[in-house]
Amino acid sequence: MLTEQFDPSTFYSPKTVAIAGLILGCVLIYVYNDYPTNVNVPVIGVGVRYTKWLAAVRNVFYARDSVAEGYKKANFAFQIPTLNRMEIFICDRKMTREYQNLDSDRMSLDAVVVEEFEFDLLSPGHGHGHRRGPDSVPIPVVAKALAWQRRRTANTNDPFFQEFMAEVSYGFQQEVQRLSQDPRSSTTTPVFTVPCFSFALQVVGRITTFALFGRPMCRDRAFLDLCGKYSDGLPRGAMLLRPWPKWMRPFIAKHMEAPQVLAKLKEIIGAEIERRKASDGESPMENIMDYFVDWAYKGRDTVPADADDTVAHVLANLIFASFHTTSQLLTDCLFEIAMRPEYVEPLREEIKDCFEKHGRETRAVLDSLFKMDSFIKETHRWNPLDASALARIAMQDFTFSNGLHIPKGSFIFTPNAPIFQDERHYSNPKIFDGFRFAKMRDDPKLKLTCDLATVGEYSLNFGLGRHACPGRYLASDEVKLSLIHLLQNFDITVDPSELPLKRVRYGKFSLADMSAKVSLRRLRSEVKG
């Protein structure tokens, strides 16, 4: 089931620790004693003067600390050891600009994604970065599809945005009814507790699949469960595969969940593609799947034989890319609201004022919620998912203008989380200020940098430049609409026993505790829509 999500805390069970120890032993034997340092920048970590393995093992769970240490100590760059490789971090902004927008045949983001998530083994098929086939859906087409859908939300003559809002309301009503049902009767309880992450994942899953596929697929419980299993199984499988030698990974991957779930997903999506092709353009484009089908088949003299499989695979990868990242952001927002009740009334007042000014079902409402947008962006600053950003693999040797040489195959990043705690870029960075970015809008020099979806050199959660996340606007809309519904209909609290809230670390990542819960108390009358 979708709610049966992977809990990283299972890594700490005795059985798992023993297995991890065995894996680590195999890795150490496999690589013998050490691996070389090929880039002339400082190495950060415990005992790195003598061996990199102590620091590499520590970085399995504390890589974020190493990145923060390197950011403080390094002049322009540093590197940290991991179990698989050295990772190079570029701190100098001039150097960052030199590599961030290079073509993929020189510095590839796609290659990093393929490597990090073991796509060749766990998601075999089309559209994988530097291995992208000639008939795959290009990334610019994906970006254009998402931009097309965003333009529809601003068109007052297009019903899409109203339907989008209605689906948010419907999704919440379904999940709340399920979670608040009294098992001893058919009634619902006014106060109920929910596992925050799984609740957020359910709602985000419904909204995202509406944007990608439309109805009725976004309301099909079996399909939603498959989407959840795939988005969960892919990163989990990659974490379990990564410590093993590469020659062993194909044998292990055969027994993992992600490839099997992907096959089922593609079968369902493929059948829907065939149904839509059969309409022969009689129905207008309504969602991202329609856009891709139109792109793949309309106006072409020759259609590739595997076009259906290509479109299905790209849609499956969009499910993976959107489900967990947006769910994590919504989860963090719910926890911050629950722990900081002083923000609730100002946010509710802003929602009320914007509804009165712009109407209930207009794009202008979302674009005018400056305090809410600020609260979400501050939550993102306070709880960055990844300590790094701008990840690339050098596809060929590269030399920066200052003479630093990067050999082919090197992994390059820039620090992300430490920037948000840097007083040079954020005033009072150790203090959570939910309306920080709303107040910045009064400054003509800063107001264009304040939106949640705006990227910049000191706001890298969504990337930067030509490779910035094209789905960030959809994620922003989904989180805002979710918070509007929750704030209008519920008081959100957290039990003191849950505090302080734990975060689960793995490598450079920090995630909300997936087992932590919040309590929802219904307000007097639930607002529909």
From Swiss-Prot:
Listed GO MF terms: heme binding; iron ion binding; monooxygenase activity; oxidoreductase activity, acting on paired donors, with incorporation or reduction of molecular oxygen
UniProt membrane topology term: Single-pass membrane protein
Binding site for heme: 469
TM region positions: 11-31
Keyword Calcium annotated: no
Keyword terms of this UniProt record: Heme, Iron, Membrane, Metal-binding, Monooxygenase, Oxidoreductase, Transmembrane, Transmembrane helix
Pfam families per record: p450
One of the protein's GO biological processes: secondary metabolic process
Pathway given in the UniProt record: Secondary metabolite biosynthesis
E.C. number: 1.-.-.-
SUPFAM superfamilies documented for this protein: Cytochrome P450 (SSF48264)
Protein family per UniProt: Belongs to the cytochrome P450 family.
Name of the protein this chain belongs to: Cytochrome P450 monooxygenase idtQ
